[in-house]
């Protein structure tokens, strides 16, 4: 099963990598086959790492975006600056 980076899913790459690792551990390959399997395993590792890095970047971006939204809005979705202005106006009315 030789698939290129753009065509293989994370799950498929990981499954193939696990199969290669198991065969290498059992020494089911000749030396030449072992080298080819190791090379394929390294390709699959890079594919998996790239997919994980992309997912991590997306999560970080979403988290940053969400934290900005959380910091800009109050409990009821009102901006904190509006709430502060209203509170200040109410305090001034008391004095």
Curated annotation (Swiss-Prot):
Positions of region (Disordered): 62-95
Q: Does the keyword Protease apply?
A: no
Keyword set, alphabetical order: Cytoplasm, Exonuclease, Hydrolase, Nuclease
Its catalytic activity?
Exonucleolytic cleavage in either 5'- to 3'- or 3'- to 5'-direction to yield nucleoside 5'-phosphates
A Gene Ontology cellular component where this protein is annotated is: exodeoxyribonuclease VII complex
Which biological processes are named by the entry's GO terms? DNA catabolic process
Q: Which InterPro entries match?
A: Exonuc_VII_S, Exonuc_VII_ssu_sf
What are the EC numbers?
A: 3.1.11.6
> Biased composition, Basic and acidic residues: where in the chain?
62-83
Report if keyword Nuclease is assigned.
yes
* Molecular function via GO: exodeoxyribonuclease VII activity
Location comes to: Cytoplasm
State whether it acts alone or in a complex, and with which partners, per the record: Heterooligomer composed of large and small subunits.
Task: Name the PANTHER family on file.
Answer: EXODEOXYRIBONUCLEASE 7 SMALL SUBUNIT (PTHR34137:SF1)
Protein family membership: Belongs to the XseB family.
- Briefly state the protein's biological role: Bidirectionally degrades single-stranded DNA into large acid-insoluble oligonucleotides, which are then degraded further into small acid-soluble oligonucleotides.
The protein in question is named Exodeoxyribonuclease 7 small subunit
Organism of this sequence: Leptospira interrogans serogroup Icterohaemorrhagiae serovar Lai (strain 56601)
């Amino acid at each position: 099963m030789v698939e290129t980076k753009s065509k293989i899913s994370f799950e498929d790459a990981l499954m193939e990598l696990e199969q290669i690792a198991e065969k290498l551990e059992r020494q089911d390959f000749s030396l030449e086959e072992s080298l080819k399997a190791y090379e394929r395993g390294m390709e699959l590792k890079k594919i998996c790492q790239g997919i994980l890095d992309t997912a991590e970047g997306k999560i970080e971006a979403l988290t940053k975006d969400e934290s900005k939204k959380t910091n800009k809005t109050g409990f009821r979705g009102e901006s904190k600056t509006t709430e502060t202005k209203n509170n200040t106006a109410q305090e001034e009315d008391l004095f």
